[in-house]
Amino acid sequence: MTSNNETDQTKRAALDLVVLQEHIRAVYAADDRPWVIGYSGGKDSTCALQLIWSAIRALPEEARRKPIFVLSSDTLVETPVIVNYIDETLAAINAAAADQNMPITAQKVVPEISDSFWVNLIGRGYPAPSKRFRWCTERLKIDPANAFIKNRVAEYGEVVMILGVRSSESATRAQVMSLHKIDGTALSRHSTLPGAFVFTPIETFSVDDVWAFLLQNQSPWESDNRDLLAMYRNAQAGECPLVVDKQTESCGNSRFGCWVCTVVTKDKAMEALVENGEDWLEPLLDLRDELAETQNPERKREFRDFRRRDGSVTFVGDAETSIPGPYLFKYRKELLRKLLEAQQQVNANAPPGEKTDLIQIEELREIRRIWRSEQGDWGDAVS
């Protein structure tokens, strides 16, 4: 039996939701700046997108006058189950938007091939990312998203970015969110992108608020949010946000994200997925753990050259040993072989519809070009 207190809480939540959706409509109608919604496929960005959709759908069609772009960033090394889920969702969003006459289009951005993870790690020999040398975030996440936003700014003059971030997630995030607030408005200035503003409609939500909204409200594009909940339970994870500046925390704990991430000691989300039945992903976990082992101070010199990429040798202070440079060419060839073997194993055991390319053909071509020009690999080790 439902208590009076629970009934009152439900009524207050419904009332708050009505007020929030009215607020969203007011912000939408206040100017001609198009919206760009950052969508990672996780609970927070799904909640924000669903809220925006339901609020704007309540407007007359003639009032839905400015475009809303749903932007998803694929690093090309995302966990395969997440990539497939997002691809299916983006297709469903575009189909539903067309059916409902919504001004919404969904698209995915990816890194430039020359900036991709494997081109840098296997092609150029960059060591696996670490807290001290996290070369990946800007190349894989920030730059592709920012390029899209800059193009929209060039086209429209200014844009408003909708981010599904919550101040309760961390003190750092709360501080960043309040730092650039524009007094008297719902918007903040973007910290690095001129012409871009930020709107955070679920800023005050708790994690319970997010799940309550998702499980009590049907997805406008007819996805089942219980599937999203099941995915979280299987991975016991958070989500990697769309990262558009260096102040926004990227992944680095138990979150959905890049399966190659070595910034953390253990990939708890991937381990949990494997333990909960997704054992076809185990070759990825094994390869990720090998990359992490190359950061072991006692073993670094097994894998890395004593010279930098430009041929110089660098010492720190009075140290007698040099700072390790890129991965040795012979180890890069070994890594490529292991990556292609992992791809074969994963696809041989993947459930129907879950097959994936761990490395793109274009990346292999760029690796071949780099190896020929920098290593004199005319024997073509890539083939």
Q: Which residues make up each language-model segment?
A:
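Nucleotide-activated chemistry modules centered on ATP-dependent adenylation/adenylyltransferase
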Residues: 1-36, 43-383
